[in-house]
Amino acid sequence: MEYSRFVDCFERRSYTAEFLEFVGFKLSSEPLGATALILGGSQAKQARYGDVNALYDAIVQIKLKESLTSLRELDPNAAVKKNKQRKVHQRVVDVFQALTNELRILNKILERSDDSVWLVYPVYTVCHDVSTFLRDTGKYMQLESRKQLWEECIRVIHRSFMICLNDKNPNMQENKRGGCILFANLEMMFYKMLRNRDMMKNLIKVLESTGMTDISRQRDNKVLKRHRSQKIIFNYFIGEYYGCYLFQFNKAQEHLQVCVSEFPVKYTSSKWFKRIIHLYTQFRMLATSNKLIHVELPRETNEKFANAYDSDLMNKCYKNGDTIVFDELIKEHAAQYLIDGTYSAMLLIKELVFLRLVKVCYKVNDKKSILPLDLIAAGYRIHFRNHDNEENRVTTTNPRKLQKKNEDLLDELECRIANLIANGRIKGYLSHSQRCMVLSKTEPFPLAS
């Protein structure tokens, strides 16, 4: 029985005669004798002869139904009282230990047999259930206790990852290596919650060394073919890591482009899609190979995609050169950008937004090589007036104060232009005495988008 057909039956609980025969054979084979530790005698018999629901329940939570039910019935306010909180904490730990014990048994079964590729997805199901259980019950735990359970959970999941990674079976149909991505996604999710950059780096190095981060090779991965959501999650974490931590924006936008192109249209209003498109827009702008004036979506769009994309304020600022609104955007969301790891990227985009303003003024000036700073200041003031609020309104008509304000603005523009020249985004030089910029006649904006 093919792996893909097995997974399909397993997910839908559509148990054909072929599926029952397949599971029955696996249960009776010598390498999988440890299944008796999971199933009781009568349950094993039922699972072997047709009651496959018993097998599924055993793999996922057969020993934990009562504990899980009691946890669901808990009053969330019970965590307020310390004595009840201790009881809840102990119950969560007991359930977690039972779940991880089941997972360790399954890992042994998975490791002992070369032909147990069929068990990869059920093991992932248990890992996913453990991680979901920890996230759902986190409100009952103190921060330190929660982190300890997360770290223990990561170790058990990593064991499943290494079993799949170390499979040397030359028959690719029976090789478990393709399942590494399933477990890697769970690990990266925990590392993100723990904000453990070093462990994320180590895991991605392993994935890079085996070629799993190569987008062209992902097309041949049967797990990613079967589970499109896993492909989206995997490339999201990889793209986020390359962009937020390594500042390799070309690689980052390539992985996020896969996420955008694979994302189901009916879910484009979800926070996941908004998060992906936000990162994709940032990194596409900063990718050195991108020389488009504005970022295009990588595939034919429909109304939902277009709406989700065009509503992005950052992209509008980039297209219009609206430095005022963009500065306000950074100030308003600075804390969130720091948490997400995108603050540095936003500062780099701020430079591009200002560059866009300079280029618009250059075109308005008929592309002459001498560009007065007063013209750039005029463009700056247009956005300044459009962004009308109490803070930005000019409250004085005193000529001296207005002159001082104008001089301060020109000084600020000089500094920002000098920064662009130093970074190679503008080819030219500043004339401080003439308050103008002299641009190259052949290539004034060598790295401009």
UniProtKB/Swiss-Prot annotation:
Location in the cell reads:
Cytoplasm; Nucleus
> What's the main place this protein lives?
cytoplasm
- Pull one GO CC term from this UniProt entry: cytoplasm
Report the Pfam families cross-referenced here.
Answer: PCI
Please give the PROSITE patterns that the UniProt record associates with this protein. Answer: PCI
Start and end of every PCI domain?
233-444
Which GO MF terms does the UniProt record name?
A: double-stranded DNA binding; RNA binding
InterPro entries, per the entry: Csn12-like, PCI_dom, WH-like_DNA-bd_sf
Describe, as the record does, how this protein assembles with itself and its partners: Component of a COP9 signalosome-like (CSN) complex.
Protein's recorded name: COP9 signalosome complex subunit 12
Per the UniProt record, the lineage of the source organism begins with: Eukaryota, Fungi, Dikarya, Ascomycota, Saccharomycotina
